[in-house]
Amino acid sequence: MKNLLDLSYEELVAEVTSLGLERYRADQILDWVFNKKVNNFDEMTNLSKQHRALLKEHFSIPFLKLLDKKVSRIDGTTKFLWELEDGNTIESVMLFHPDRITACISTQVGCPVKCIFCATGMSGFVRNLTTGEIVAQILSMEREEKKKIGNVVYMGMGEPLLNYENTIKSIRILNHKKMGNIGIRRITISTVGIPDRIIQLAEEGLDVKLALSLHAPTNFKRDQLVPLNKKYSIEEILNAVKIYQRKTGNRVTIEYVLIRGINDEISDAKKLAEILKNMKIFVNLIPVNPTAEDLKKPSRERLLAFKRILLENGIEAEIRREKGSDIEAACGQLRLKRIKSTS
């Protein structure tokens, strides 16, 4: 039995017609799933009983099982703990803005990158999510909250470019006008920097936004913060980003988590401005959020000084407004709960 949420539009049409159904039946099914949030064929009343029975034999539509939900008293940010069909768990977040609703979704159970300031990496890595499991996060949040998500950031648990095929396919599904119908420029992939995949992304014809989690201006410091840097140096990553920009023309966001006494020195700001010189970028400065590690935020004065140096050197920069930290839903705070090994 196939997970219908794993299928692209073209694949679903092919599957439906191979069963002897008319092509337009695929559109009817997708309207039920993506617009009405119905995942039971028996409720799809514009399909005949015979067709419903046939579809039930061949497809499942597994939304996610909600284990827990926490709502921030500060800003309404909502964090969801989901159970997957194999018993593993992931977290997703819904963020509310005056003009939009953004979903922060996961691409892996755990994360193999193990950034020292990120709770997800502390829990280890179990497996990649399927395309359907990535898509189901959006549908399950929309059904639970009865609200339409307009923006998606691939910034939850996991490194999206280490689950490349499923990440890209899920984006095509979420963007398709008869499926998720989310504008492509409203979708952002965040990566610590996998050079060959960044270059491959430029060839996909997907005009998504790209965010690079850099966090340090030198390899010496980044090796300590992002262990994967020992495999892919800052120079290799930024070279890939430059190739990406030449091919797409798109501005790239640089994510920089600021940690007191580690990467927040004035010299760090000057070096960061130097390595990003002449690039079409925007820097998001993120004061570190509390996790199990004893890492401290810089002072407000230091944050402003860091930002000022970037601006003085022609680098656009802003200090990100924190959302959901009181429920551990902010940057770097998502973690695995009740891990069950699939081995």
UniProtKB/Swiss-Prot annotation:
Keywords per UniProt? 4Fe-4S, Cytoplasm, Disulfide bond, Iron, Iron-sulfur, Metal-binding, Methyltransferase, rRNA processing, S-adenosyl-L-methionine, Transferase, tRNA processing
Gene Ontology cellular component annotations, sorted alphabetically: cytoplasm
Give the range the annotation lists for the signal sequence. Answer: none
Q: Where is the Radical SAM core domain?
A: 97-326
The set of disulfide-linked cysteines is 104-331
Q: Which SMART domains match?
A: Elp3
Pfam short name (any one): Radical_SAM
Q: What class of enzyme is it?
A: transferase
| SUPFAM superfamilies to which the protein is assigned, alphabetical | Radical SAM enzymes
Q: Which reaction does it catalyse?
A: adenosine(2503) in 23S rRNA + 2 reduced [2Fe-2S]-[ferredoxin] + 2 S-adenosyl-L-methionine = 2-methyladenosine(2503) in 23S rRNA + 5'-deoxyadenosine + L-methionine + 2 oxidized [2Fe-2S]-[ferredoxin] + S-adenosyl-L-homocysteine; adenosine(37) in tRNA + 2 reduced [2Fe-2S]-[ferredoxin] + 2 S-adenosyl-L-methionine = 2-methyladenosine(37) in tRNA + 5'-deoxyadenosine + L-methionine + 2 oxidized [2Fe-2S]-[ferredoxin] + S-adenosyl-L-homocysteine
The EC number of this protein is: 2.1.1.192
What function does the entry list? Specifically methylates position 2 of adenine 2503 in 23S rRNA and position 2 of adenine 37 in tRNAs.
**PANTHER family in the cross-refs:** 23S RRNA METHYLTRANSFERASE, RADICAL SAM CORE DOMAIN-CONTAINING PROTEIN
Give any extra note attached to this record.
Reaction proceeds by a ping-pong mechanism involving intermediate methylation of a conserved cysteine residue.
Q: What is this protein called?
A: Probable dual-specificity RNA methyltransferase RlmN
Q: Which organism is it from?
A: Thermotoga sp. (strain RQ2)
